[in-house]
From Swiss-Prot:
It is found in: Cytoplasm. It comes from Vibrio cholerae serotype O1 (strain ATCC 39315 / El Tor Inaba N16961). Its EC number is 2.1.1.185. It is an enzyme of class 2 (transferase). The keyword Ribosomal protein does not apply. S-adenosyl-L-methionine binds at residues 197, 217, 226. One of its GO terms (molecular function) is RNA binding. This is 23S rRNA (guanosine-2'-O-)-methyltransferase RlmB. The lineage of its organism: Bacteria, Pseudomonadati, Pseudomonadota, Gammaproteobacteria, Vibrionales. Specifically methylates the ribose of guanosine 2251 in 23S rRNA.
Length: 247
């Protein structure tokens, strides 16, 4: 696999904290010196990472116009997690909270969902290999470092993985507009996986049928649905609220 670009202070700092050996080189805006950037640059230099100063136009071109905050790094790709890693992840959590994204192919939405997952303490985000956005620099930037901290598990057969986790005691709750009860009427404690579908299409049929329960977010206005990353945040933090109340 070829090296990857990550950009933005949050994303670079997250890799520094978790896996600094991945760094190949870094590019920084010429003349930029500020309190947020300097500690990151100092740590990169301490690690012996080559740092090149570049003009804003050169950085913009390298980041393909995305907001890079004056810092881009070239890193070795992280090891891609798969279904075989789930047992180890579950073993680290007494009552894991998981997030399943079925068909989220927009990198901005995936990045925002990863950021939500990190904030909510999600043990892992599970996606199908064939129906998910790849982990690009855009995803890492939108995720503000969460793409480097939240385990992203790509599985070959999502329904089969769900059934295997059900046998280990994980309860799967899917989100669907036609559900008969909403998230505030549902128990979201214990070993739980919240399943979100793609915007518009929702969950695929087999994913929906494999869920233990279906819930919806109550909508009071004229809009029929929320952006998937917004809906993801609403559901995850209702689960967090219930879990905190049960302590």
């Amino acid at each position: 696999m070829s090296n990857e670009l990550i950009y933005g202070i949050h994303a670079v700092n997250a890799v520094l904290q978790r896996d600094p050996a991945r760094f190949v080189e870094a590019y920084v805006l010429k003349g930029r010196q500020d309190d947020r950037l300097l500690p990151v640059l100092n740590e990169l230099m301490r690690l012996g990472v080559s740092i090149q100063e570049m003009s804003r136009k050169a950085l913009d071109d390298k980041a393909e116009g995305a907001n890079h905050q004056g810092l881009i790094a070239r890193v070795k790709p992280a090891r891609q997690l798969n279904e075989n890693d789930l047992d180890d992840i579950l073993a680290q959590h007494e009552q894991p909270l998981l997030l399943v994204l079925d068909g989220v192919t927009d990198p901005h939405n995936l990045g925002a969902c990863l950021r939500n997952a990190d904030a909510a303490g999600v043990a892992a985000v599970i996606v199908p290999k064939d129906k998910s956005a790849p982990l690009t620099a855009t995803v890492s930037k939108v995720a503000c470092g969460a793409a480097e901290t939240v385990p992203l598990v790509r599985v070959t057969n999502l329904a089969r993985t769900m059934r295997a986790l059900q046998e280990k005691g994980v309860w799967f709750v899917g989100t669907a507009g036609e559900a008969t009860h909403d998230i505030y009427q549902s128990k979201l404690t214990g070993s739980l996986a919240i399943v979100m579908g793609a915007e518009g299409d929702g969950m695929r049929r087999l994913t929906r049928e494999t869920c233990d329960d279906l819930i919806k977010i109550p909508m009071a206005g004229s809009v029929s649905s929320l952006n998937v990353s917004v809906a993801c945040g609403v559901c995850l933090f209702e689960a967090v609220r219930q879990r905190m109340a049960n302590r």
